[in-house]
């Protein structure tokens, strides 16, 4: 997972509230067995609207999504985060997030910042006035900026640290690799343990 300190790019105003994970990526796409390639599934039902942002040239290559309250509610599905990430988004700002979605985002390298509803309206107004406007989301300073506009956002310290360091669950575990190895060597030999992978298995 790549570390995140600052995200700068085209901002998208998603003027919808209560966007659940099924709207972000419908269930029929959950049958895929890879963790990438979900950009075509993002907001699949809404793509049929010619006015929706994915069909607007001004928002091509967007990296910052500014959504209404209660974004990412509903069932837990990492695919929602993968779809946003694969499309190109690196940060999402909203007054409220679904707790599970927010947790999944931090583990998958997607910054989710909590901003007030008034500040969301201010960001939307700026993007409406200039479609394709660049926004900067600064994780170090915890502020989002556009020309002439600065708004603060909240993010818990643990998730902020993981994003700044670029630590997914595997990388986080490997930080303690020496301690894990020491524990395994001291553990009684009669206890269950994971056997080393056979060379033939590694070749397949």
From Swiss-Prot:
The lineage of its organism: Bacteria, Bacillati, Actinomycetota, Actinomycetes, Micrococcales. Its EC number is 4.2.1.33. Keywords: Amino-acid biosynthesis, Branched-chain amino acid biosynthesis, Leucine biosynthesis, Lyase. The keyword Transcription regulation does not apply. PANTHER family: 3-ISOPROPYLMALATE DEHYDRATASE SMALL SUBUNIT, 3-ISOPROPYLMALATE DEHYDRATASE SMALL SUBUNIT 2-RELATED-RELATED. It catalyses: (2R,3S)-3-isopropylmalate = (2S)-2-isopropylmalate. This is 3-isopropylmalate dehydratase small subunit. Belongs to the LeuD family. LeuD type 1 subfamily. One of its GO terms (biological process) is L-leucine biosynthetic process. Heterodimer of LeuC and LeuD. InterPro entries: 3-IsopropMal_deHydase_ssu (IPR004431), Aconitase/3IPM_dehydase_swvl (IPR015928), AconitaseA/IPMdHydase_ssu_swvl (IPR000573), IPMI_Swivel (IPR033940), LeuD (IPR050075). It is an enzyme of class 4 (lyase). Gene3D superfamilies: Aconitase, domain 4. Catalyzes the isomerization between 2-isopropylmalate and 3-isopropylmalate, via the formation of 2-isopropylmaleate. Pathway: Amino-acid biosynthesis; L-leucine biosynthesis; L-leucine from 3-methyl-2-oxobutanoate: step 2/4. It comes from the Bacteria. CDD domains: IPMI_Swivel. GO terms for molecular function: 3-isopropylmalate dehydratase activity. One of its GO terms (cellular component) is 3-isopropylmalate dehydratase complex.
């Amino acid at each position: 997972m790549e570390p995140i300190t600052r995200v700068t790019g085209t901002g998208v105003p998603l003027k919808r509230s209560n966007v659940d994970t099924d709207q972000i990526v419908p269930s029929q796409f959950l049958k895929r067995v890879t963790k990438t390639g979900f950009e075509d599934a993002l907001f699949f039902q809404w793509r049929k609207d010619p006015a929706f942002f994915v069909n607007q040239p001004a928002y091509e290559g967007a990296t910052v999504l500014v959504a209404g309250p209660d974004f990412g509610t509903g069932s837990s599905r990492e695919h929602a985060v993968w779809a946003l990430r694969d499309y190109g988004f690196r940060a999402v700002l909203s007054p409220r997030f679904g707790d599970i979605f927010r947790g999944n985002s931090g583990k998958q390298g997607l910054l989710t910042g909590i901003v007030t509803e008034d500040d969301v309206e201010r960001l939307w107004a700026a993007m409406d006035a200039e479609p394709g406007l660049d926004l900067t989301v600064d994780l170090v300073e915890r502020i989002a900026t556009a020309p002439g506009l600065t708004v603060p956002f909240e993010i818990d310290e643990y998730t902020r640290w993981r994003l700044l360091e670029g630590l997914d669950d595997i990388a986080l575990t490997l930080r303690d690799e020496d301690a894990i190895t020491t524990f395994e060597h001291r553990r009684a030999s009669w206890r269950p343990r994971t056997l080393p992978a056979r060379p033939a298995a590694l070749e397949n």
